[in-house]
């Protein structure tokens, strides 16, 4: 590298999350892309995360050997826990926030947990806040999450929608008790059906997914 026209050799890599890190990864790993393509392997890469897609265990082992040889010569170290051979028809694998398995994809567990943590953070202190305000706080989170995971396996969105509505019903029940309202009778999902939250503007992941599927 050059600094003030003087050459120097950095002893550490760029900080994780730095704006320039993906660019440097693309520049440095571009030869690996061409090598794998030239050898007939299919590889998908984003910055320094990549997966090789192979038709047999033998081909996968050969592809991994090529990658190991190249990275060693390039003075790079493969992540010991992330570097492995898997059968996507049985075990599946995580990549860029998704879990891929049997030709389908859905948010990996860590991505689901992160979304739920964000919703909990926005709905943890709701005293004095009406439902419209709570929904206004969580809708941007849901829209952003959907924007990235909208191509997930469809049942995923129904499951997450259900979890969010149960969370909101719990809040409504708690608020009624704090307001001194008499004991509630009947199931929460009957008292506050799905249409109730739709009427109050709650962003529906399932509804958004259906709209994407129907668009030309």
Regions flagged by a language model, labelled:
Residues 1-216:
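Non-catalytic terminal/accessory segments
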């Amino acid at each position: 590298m050059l600094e003030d026209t003087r050459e120097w050799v950095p002893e550490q890599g760029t900080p994780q999350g730095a704006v320039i890190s993906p660019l440097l990864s693309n520049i440095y790993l571009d030869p690996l892309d061409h090598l794998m393509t030239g050898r007939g392997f299919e590889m998908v890469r984003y910055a320094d995360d990549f997966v090789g897609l192979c038709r047999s265990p033998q081909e996968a082992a050969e592809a991994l050997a090529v990658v190991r040889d190249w990275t060693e010569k390039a003075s790079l170290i493969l992540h010991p826990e992330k570097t492995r051979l898997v059968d996507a028809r049985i075990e599946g694998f995580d990549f860029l926030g998704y879990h891929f398995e049997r030709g389908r994809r859905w948010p990996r567990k860590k991505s689901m947990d992160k979304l739920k943590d964000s919703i909990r953070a926005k709905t943890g202190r709701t005293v004095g806040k009406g439902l419209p305000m709570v929904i206004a706080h969580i809708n941007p989170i849901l829209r952003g999450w959907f924007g990235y995971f909208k191509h997930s396996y469809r049942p995923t969105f129904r499951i997450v929608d259900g979890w969010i509505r149960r969370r909101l019903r719990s809040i409504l029940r708690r608020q009624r008790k704090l307001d001194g309202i008499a004991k509630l009778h009947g199931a929460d999902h009957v008292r506050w059906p799905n249409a109730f939250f739709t009427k109050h503007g709650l962003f529906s992941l399932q509804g958004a997914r259906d709209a994407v599927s129907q668009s030309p």
